[in-house]
A protein has these predicted regions:
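RNA pseudouridine synthases
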Residues: 1-131
């Protein structure tokens, strides 16, 4: 799907179910719920197989279990190929999730270590050609 705005922030409360290996968005006062904050920006969007698709850049403020998958599904824009959080989604499509960048401070030198790549996987083929 495509978000309603070109960029935004989702703030939800997530609760993990370890037995089912799933998390869900719940009301703030739910016991065991943890705050989850996700920023997004639409990099590209197009029609594919009769459906609107968007390529998003995500920045997490928090690192919750399946956070991106849960928050996007809860917002009505589940990831392409995510059968766990969008059971009615397309079958046979790879999960449209790729960590394209990682940065952290080296524990000994203090130097910022930064790693980047293009999105990988068949879910990104139509988008990567344009990047």
């Amino acid at each position: 799907g495509v978000p309603g705005k070109q960029e935004g922030i989702f703030i939800d409360y997530l609760k993990k179910n370890g037995k089912a290996n799933m998390s869900q968005a719940v009301p703030e006062n739910t016991p065991g719920a943890k705050k989850a904050i996700l920023h997004y920006r639409v990099l590209d969007q197009k029609e594919m197989n009769g459906k609107s698709r968007a390529l998003l850049k995500i920045k997490l403020e928090t690192g919750r279990h399946h956070q991106i998958r849960v928050q996007l599904s809860h917002a009505g824009i589940p990831l392409l190929g995510d059968r766990k959080y969008n059971p009615s989604g397309e079958k046979g499509t790879s999960l449209g999730l790729c960590s394209c960048g990682l940065a952290f401070k080296h524990p000994k030198t203090g130097k910022i270590m930064k790693f980047e790549t293009e999105p990988q996987g068949t879910a990104f083929l139509d988008f990567v050609k344009k990047l």
